[in-house]
Curated annotation (Swiss-Prot):
Its main location: cytoplasm. Belongs to the thiolase-like superfamily. FabH family. Homodimer. Catalyzes the condensation reaction of fatty acid synthesis by the addition to an acyl acceptor of two carbons from malonyl-ACP. Catalyzes the first condensation reaction which initiates fatty acid synthesis and may therefore play a role in governing the total rate of fatty acid production. Possesses both acetoacetyl-ACP synthase and acetyl transacylase activities. Its substrate specificity determines the biosynthesis of branched-chain and/or straight-chain of fatty acids. The active site is at C112, H235, N265. This is Beta-ketoacyl-[acyl-carrier-protein] synthase III 1. Signal peptide: none annotated. Pathway: Lipid metabolism; fatty acid biosynthesis. GO terms for cellular component: cytoplasm. Residues 236-240 are annotated as: ACP-binding. PANTHER family: 3-OXOACYL-[ACYL-CARRIER-PROTEIN] SYNTHASE (PTHR43091), BETA-KETOACYL-[ACYL-CARRIER-PROTEIN] SYNTHASE III, CHLOROPLASTIC (PTHR43091:SF1). It catalyses: malonyl-[ACP] + acetyl-CoA + H(+) = 3-oxobutanoyl-[ACP] + CO2 + CoA. It comes from Bacillus cereus (strain ATCC 14579 / DSM 31 / CCUG 7414 / JCM 2152 / NBRC 15305 / NCIMB 9373 / NCTC 2599 / NRRL B-3711). The keyword Nuclease does not apply.
Length: 310
């Protein structure tokens, strides 16, 4: 059985915070932020919008895109590091909101790589015949765990949610290969205490090495080469990290998603948010070979070779 994406949706808050806005509250500049990260602005949720609200809105759009209802969903997986509370899970909030009365529901935590973990967990459940339709959501309100006095982290993050419905697709479409990995010895480099804490130098070194390597490994597993890749959707973390992955695949710039300028790093939601953007812009077409790749705290990483279409 081939398993792929049947529908996709996203939600981003209306409030835009630009680099110039940040100049007013901390010692930084638009030039400093753009040069080091590629970010110009990010969306920030106000106090009335929490992680579950964003997740529900993205889920509704994914269901609509898939042409199914909540009652058709068998399992809900939510990747988040900013749940509204320890329990109930964000997935359970979604279950009630979309009327998925037949669905099991749980959250998982793999930081910015969480969507990749959720996507492959869903694929495995579907491929074994356990479930038919699985809703996978990445949703994070990182603005609530960022120290707004720390220019090294505060400038990076935004809020948002992305969701996909996964199920059976035509032969040759969907997930062709994948890789998930973790290195717990690097957990000290990126973690949450009261706020997000990051050793930027070490995270950069890890990400530059791991993203490119993961892309090449999933291609090899699928019996494909760099020349077969039509589009790259990396986790939107840092322009220099993303460029390193693109260069490893010998792709031109127009073949890589770069939504970081508009949305910043939205953690587990960054890949589906970027995919929606590229679909709307017509840059992802039916039959395209897409590489999805992400990394996050843990340290964790994941990559998927995906043939787009149903």
């Amino acid at each position: 059985m081939n398993v792929g994406i049947l529908g996709i949706g996203r939600y981003v808050p209306e409030k835009v915070v630009t680099n110039h806005d940040l100049e007013k509250i901390m010692e930084t500049s638009d030039e400093w932020i753009r040069t080091r990260t590629g970010i110009a602005e990010r969306r920030i949720a106000d106090d009335t919008i929490d992680t579950s609200y964003m997740a529900v809105e993205a889920s509704k759009k994914a269901l609509e895109d898939a042409g199914i209802s909540g009652e058709d969903i068998d399992l809900i997986l939510v990747a988040t590091v900013t749940p509204d509370r320890a329990f109930p899970a964000v997935a359970c909030v979604i279950q009630e909101a979309i009327g998925a009365k037949h669905a099991a529901a749980m959250d998982l935590s793999a930081a910015c790589a969480g969507f990749m973990y959720g996507m492959i967990t869903a694929q495995q459940f579907i491929q074994t015949g356990t479930y038919k339709n699985v809703l996978v959501v990445g949703s994070d309100k990182l603005s609530k765990i960022v120290d707004w006095n720390d220019r090294n982290t505060a400038v990076l993050f935004g809020d948002g949610a992305g969701a996909v419905v996964m199920g059976a697709v035509s032969e040759g479409k969907g997930v062709l290969s994948f890789e998930l990995g973790a290195d717990g010895s690097g957990g000290k480099h990126l973690y949450q205490d009261e706020y997000v804490m990051m050793n930027g130098r070490e995270v950069f070194k890890f990400a530059v090495r791991q993203l490119g390597d993961s892309c090449l490994r999933v291609l090899d597993k699928a019996g494909l080469t760099k020349e077969d890749v039509d589009f790259l959707v990396p986790h939107q973390a840092n322009i220099r990290i993303m460029e390193s992955a693109r260069e490893r695949l010998n792709l031109p710039q127009e073949k890589m998603s770069m939504t970081i300028e508009k949305f910043g790093n939205t953690s587990a939601s960054s890949i589906p948010i970027a995919m929606v953007e590229e679909l709307q812009n017509g840059r992802i077409q039916d039959g395209d070979l897409i590489i999805l790749v992400g990394f996050g705290g843990g340290l964790t990483w994941g990559a998927v070779a995906l043939r787009w279409g149903k």
